[in-house]
Amino acid sequence: MKPSDVRSKAFAMPLTSPAFPMGPYRFVDREFLIITYRTDPDRLREIVPEPLQVTEPLVHYEFIRMADSTGFGDYTESGQVIPVEYNGQPGGYTLAMYLDDHPPIAGGRELWGFPKKLASPTLHVNTDHILGTLDYGKVRVATGTMGYKHKELDIDEQTKRLAGPNFLLKIIPHVDGTARVCELVRYYMQDIKMKGAWTGPASLELAPHALAPVADLPVLEIVEARHLVADLTLGLGEVVYDYLAQ
């Protein structure tokens, strides 16, 4: 294969059979259980990278069911998103996500810089409540529950919240182990069609784990819980800050 052919075909690895396809990446009936809780503000400031700023001591713990997604297939994801500001613009910083499907792990890390790791999350309705779990290996590290569809939420407001900016710290090492890419990336959910939004009483339990340290941000108080169902497109990102250029 000629170098020009390599350049023209290069998108993702392996070259002859990429782990994920080119977008756009559309999700149908994407289901969220988002439990917002209050935590230790000092711990948040220790882990959120500047120039992002922590404005409130809050964490969104998310369980996301994606049964129909372009090129990524059928999978579930779970992790923590921290409300932040960037140059006065409110958004969410994704701290870590755990999922059970290789293509979105590879694509998420290589394209956007999603901090994804392999684990075993679930999200489903259990009789009268929606239940989210996260197992890392044989250890249950997160359990979230919410009463099923106790109260409807405003569709327009929830659509606006979901459409806000999201931030990622993309890190790709050089072949010698030094950082080749270290960037703050911003992306948006696009073409959102909110199909339902509900709230109800909720609980969240986090357990310690050396390699899935969700409990490092302890649950001090449940602030809000939301169950959302939406169709949406995961937009590609833009670099807003290059740490290696500073």
Swiss-Prot record:
SUPFAM superfamilies per record: Acetoacetate decarboxylase-like
Enzyme class: lyase
Keywords: Decarboxylase, Lyase, Schiff base
Residues annotated as the enzyme's active site: 116 (schiff-base intermediate with acetoacetate)
Highest rank taxon of the organism: Bacteria
Keyword Lyase among UniProt keywords: yes
Enzyme Commission numbers on file: 4.1.1.4
InterPro entries: Acetoacetate_decarboxylase, Acetoacetate_decarboxylase_bac, ADC_dom_sf
Catalytic activity annotation: acetoacetate + H(+) = acetone + CO2
Gene Ontology molecular function, alphabetical: acetoacetate decarboxylase activity
Signal peptide: none
HAMAP family assigned to the protein according to its UniProt record, in alphabetical order: ADC (MF_00597)
Family to which the UniProt record says this protein belongs: Belongs to the ADC family.
Name this polypeptide is given: Acetoacetate decarboxylase
Organism: Burkholderia lata (strain ATCC 17760 / DSM 23089 / LMG 22485 / NCIMB 9086 / R18194 / 383)
